[in-house]
Curated annotation (Swiss-Prot):
This is Envelope glycoprotein B. A motif (Internalization motif) lies at residues 889-892. Residues 168-174, 253-260 are annotated as: Involved in fusion and/or binding to host membrane. It is a single-pass type I membrane protein. The chain crosses the membrane at residues 772-792. Residues 793-904 are intravirion. Residues 40-83, 467-490, 816-835, 883-904 are annotated as: Disordered. Residues 23-771 are virion surface. GO terms for biological process: symbiont entry into host cell; virion attachment to host cell.
């Protein structure tokens, strides 16, 4: 603070010196003009220009908008000394106004000297805290295990026979099912081993028990035979199937009777089977449950596994060679085959021991960077790779407590060795064996601590030195007892969500960062306070006012009374009531100057004017005892209100803002780092496929198999229609089959002829039953009736008027022609009614001969058909007819002759 006052004094002094050197000496300004007593002439030499007198502090000026210092007025000598002094006073007032209004809230304080009524002391240094940190940080690699929810899967083979009994009633043109009975029968063990697996055939009969009664079904209601197994038409990706028949057998047709038909279809099907913990049962892909452990058997103590069936229903075959029913190839290596018969089917599968076929834990994550830290009574395993933190106890977890956990140690060692060889083989060494911890949420952590090669060498050297210092006959420390093998086993249940571990990791991440940051802040703050306390204890001896004001939090005055400080409260003074004088020289003592600028102030706006001296940090001193010898080159900056005043050669020069002075920071940097960004990646304990596959029964697979069963083992495209002639053909075929080879040959011919006749009749019947065929037949009948009607009319017309019927055009021309031209030449024709009688007689004769020729030809044709005698008789008759004389009579006139002539 004193440095600032000294600079201000130097500035004012320099300004006064510059003004004094440029202006002549002048009398002091009257106090009444400004209410301020100011020195107008500098001691030690003439002044060509009096320094400007500052304006009263009560005058308010407008607020400055720029912080650049105003240019100094040019030192041109005015024509009048009084005018020069007035101009200098105005300039100084303007500068002071700008300084005051730059920071309007800057207060001046009058601090009376303390009397010792109030004394204070400083607190002693405190003991700084230590920030909390984790203990026993250990780096290493880890393998995280979770509960194995996947079922145990294996292949099984089903043997069963589909029995279908259908009751059909046959009508004349249709058939109707009156009932269909369907059932499944198991295949006996002997037939599976001796027939199906050895020869690839199956018996056509099915013997099974229903309602505690044994029954037998015969395929096609015939005697027992061996039927060959053939591959199913449709094979899935996971299973194959074989069967003996495609079509259902229907009974022969007998109209108006109920008939029964039996179909036995032997089916062998490979299916997937699955079983879940505790493996007391398994289910097939068809949806059939088997209430027996898949590990049940008669070897290696497996008879203790669960079963719900009688002993005679189960059979275990050692040295079983399975056969591929498609290629007929035999397996190269034998297996132990389990066979179980149920009321509906027989199932077979390869037996394997329970250990190590199944494991209740499975590997989840392999973490190549895992940090273990001890917090209180727990371990926290954190990994940035998977953004999780696992919390465990400080004690290790024994693997012997895990039921069916043989795979944990094996898989953990393999994964740890693989990660170590890939990343840490050249830089680290393993510390001991893998350690196992059970984390919250059901996660088992296999942790392998690591140590860098450098630290390992240091530890080895230290260990060797400790061994050298120990006595030779020291008793070795007892080894830790191995965990008891009789400890109760349990199954670890793993939660399906990892969010709690993610939240724990986030909390630990934030907690570690915040605790570290707050710890550094607390330590730095405490140390800083202790350092400042030492400085304050020393600084209070130099400037007790500043130290006391900073400590109390408000402006006070203080002085040391031994080891304590006496303080008194300072009185604030409004900035408008304070003015600074332009000279720092003591007029009555040449060579002596004030070290701080002189000021005049009022406590109140209308109060009396008090002379004083500007102290440090806007303090107004009531005395003017701050003196110093005048020096050459004096320059000082003093805090005045919200800015600085500059004195040069103990005279006011100009003003400037605080921003124009370079600031040197005295703060201690606080090491606070921002929380680093961390992105969470999706992390699933169990994938969607694992959750879907965790159930004992896959309903999708069951429905798919049930709906695909008919497509695989039945012919759905062949249709057997109702046929009334089927019984007849079946009887004929059976009749000719019983007559040997000759009967079969004759039967083929007869069957062909009968088939043709039946086909023709069936074709006509089908054509007539068709609506379009019936319409065509109706149209043909109608056309025949119309033709018969016209033929009948023609015959009637021919009988009534043959000439008109035979020669309609000729008769029509004769009717329309001139009757006079028809008679021909001469008058005889005219007299005879227009007709020539001779020609008419010739026409009649021609017609008679035509009838005679027709009769002779018919007689000869009939005689040729009858024989030689008839032909001779016909010849004689013809000769007689040719020799016959003409008739000797004259034609009689018909009474209708006139009508006939009209028609002609």
């Amino acid at each position: 603070m004193r440095g600032g006052g000294l600079i201000c004094a130097l500035v004012v002094g320099a300004l006064v010196a510059a003004v004094a050197s440029a202006a002549p000496a002048a009398p002091a300004a009257p106090r009444a003009s400004g209410g301020v007593a100011a020195t107008v002439a500098a001691n030690g030499g003439p002044a060509s220009r009096p320094p400007p007198v500052p304006s009263p502090a009560t005058t308010k000026a407008r607020k400055r908008k720029t912080k650049k210092p105003p240019k100094r007025p040019e030192a041109t000598p005015p024509p009048d000394a009084n005018a020069t002094v007035a101009a200098g006073h105005a300039t100084l007032r303007a500068h002071l106004r700008e300084i005051k209004v730059e920071n309007a809230d800057a207060q001046f304080y009058v601090c009376p000297p303390p009397t010792g009524a109030t004394v204070v002391q400083f607190e002693q240094p405190r003991r700084c805290p230590t920030r909390p940190e984790g203990q026993n940080y250990t780096e290493g690699i880890a393998v995280v295990f979770k509960e194995n929810i996947a079922p145990y899967k294996f292949k099984a083979t089903m043997y069963y026979k589909d029995v279908t009994v259908s009751q059909v009633w046959f009508g004349h043109r249709y058939s109707q099912f009156m009932g269909i009975f369907e059932d499944r029968a198991p295949v006996p063990f002997e037939e599976v081993i001796d027939k199906i697996n050895t020869k690839g055939v199956c018996r056509s009969t099915a013997k099974y028990v229903r309602n505690n009664m044994e029954t037998t079904a015969f395929h096609r209601d015939d005697h027992e035979t061996d039927m060959e197994l053939k591959p199913a038409k449709v094979a899935t990706r996971t299973s194959r199937g074989w069967h003996t028949t495609d079509l259902k057998y229907n009974p022969s047709r007998v109209e108006a009777f109920h008939r029964y038909g039996t179909t036995v279809n032997c089916i062998v099907e490979e299916v997937d089977a699955r079983s879940v913990y505790p493996y007391d049962e398994f289910v097939l892909a068809t949806g059939d449950f088997v209430y027996m452990s898949p590990f049940y058997g008669y070897r290696e103590g497996s008879h203790t596994e669960h079963t719900s069936y009688a002993a005679d229903r189960f059979k275990q075959v050692d040295g079983f060679y399975a056969r591929d029913l498609t290629t007929k190839a035999r397996a190269t290596s034998p297996t132990t085959r389990n066979l179980l018969t149920t009321p509906k089917f027989t199932v077979a599968w390869d037996w394997v021991p329970k250990r190590p076929a199944v494991c209740t834990m499975t590997k989840w994550q392999e973490v190549d960077e895992m940090l273990r830290a001890e917090y209180g009574g727990s371990f926290r395993f954190s990994s940035d790779a998977i953004s999780t933190t696992f919390t465990t106890n400080l004690t290790e977890y024994s693997l012997s407590r895990v039921d069916l956990g043989d795979c944990i140690g094996r898989d953990a060692r393999e994964a740890i060795d693989r990660m170590f060889a890939r990343k840490y083989n050249a830089t680290h060494i393993k510390v001991g064996q893998p350690q196992y911890y059970l984390a919250t949420g059901g996660f088992l952590i296999a942790y392998q601590p690591l140590l860098s090669n450098t630290l390992a060498e240091l530890y080895v050297r230290e260990y060797m030195r400790e061994q050298d210092r120990k006595p030779r006959n020291a008793t070795p420390a007892p080894l830790r007892e191995a965990p008891s093998a009789n400890a109760s086993v349990e199954r670890i249940k793993t939660t399906s969500s990892i969010e709690f571990a993610r939240l724990q990791f986030t909390y630990n991440h934030i907690q570690r960062h915040v605790n570290d940051m707050l710890g550094r802040i607390a330590v730095a703050w405490c140390e800083l306070q202790n350092h400042e306390l030492t400085l304050w204890n020393e600084a209070r001896k130099l400037n007790p006012n500043a130290i006391a004001s900073a400590t109390v939090g408000r402006r006070v005055s203080a002085r040391m009374l031994g080891d304590v400080m006496a303080v008194s409260t300072c009185v604030p003074v409004a900035p408008d009531n304070v003015i600074v004088q332009n000279s720092m020289r003591v007029s009555s003592r040449p060579g002596t100057c004030y070290s701080r600028p002189l000021v005049s102030f009022r406590y109140e706006d209308q109060g009396p004017l008090i002379e004083g001296q500007l102290g440090e940090n806007n303090e107004l001193r009531l005395t003017r005892d701050a003196l110093e010898p005048c020096t050459v080159g004096h320059r000082r900056y003093f805090i005045f209100g919200g800015g600085y005043v500059y004195f040069e050669e103990y005279a006011y020069s100009h003003q400037l803002s605080r921003a124009d002075v370079t600031t040197v920071s005295t703060f201690i940097d606080l090491n606070i780092t921002m929380l680093e960004d961390h992105e969470f990646v999706p992390l699933e304990v169990y994938t969607r496929h694992e959750i879907k596959d965790s159930g004992l029964l896959d309903y999708t697979e069951v429905q798919r198999r049930n709906q695909l069963h008919d497509l695989r083992f039945a012919d759905i495209d062949t249709v057997i229609r109702a046929d009334a002639n089927a019984a007849m053909f079946a009887g004929l075929c059976a009749f000719f089959e019983g007559m040997g080879d000759l009967g079969r040959a004759v039967g083929k011919v007869v069957m062909g002829v009968v088939g043709g006749v039946v086909s023709a009749v069936s074709g006509v019947s089908s054509f007539m039953s068709n609506p379009f065929g019936a319409l065509a037949v109706g149209l043909l009948v109608l056309a025949g009736l119309v033709a018969a009607f016209f033929a009948f009319r023609y015959v009637l017309q021919l009988q009534r008027n043959p000439m008109k019927a035979l020669y309609p055009l000729t008769t029509k021309e004769l009717k329309t022609s001139d009757p006079g031209g028809v008679g021909g030449e001469g008058e005889e024709g005219a007299e005879g009614g227009g007709f020539d009688e001779a020609k008419l007689a010739e026409a009649r004769e021609m017609i008679r001969y035509m009838a005679l020729v027709s009769a002779m030809e018919r007689t000869e044709h009939k005689a040729r058909k009858k024989g030689t005698s008839a032909l001779l008789s016909s010849k004689v008759t013809n000769m007689v007819l040719r020799k016959r004389n003409k008739a000797r009579y004259s034609p009689l006139h018909n009474e209708d002759e006139a009508g006939d002539e009209d028609e002609l």
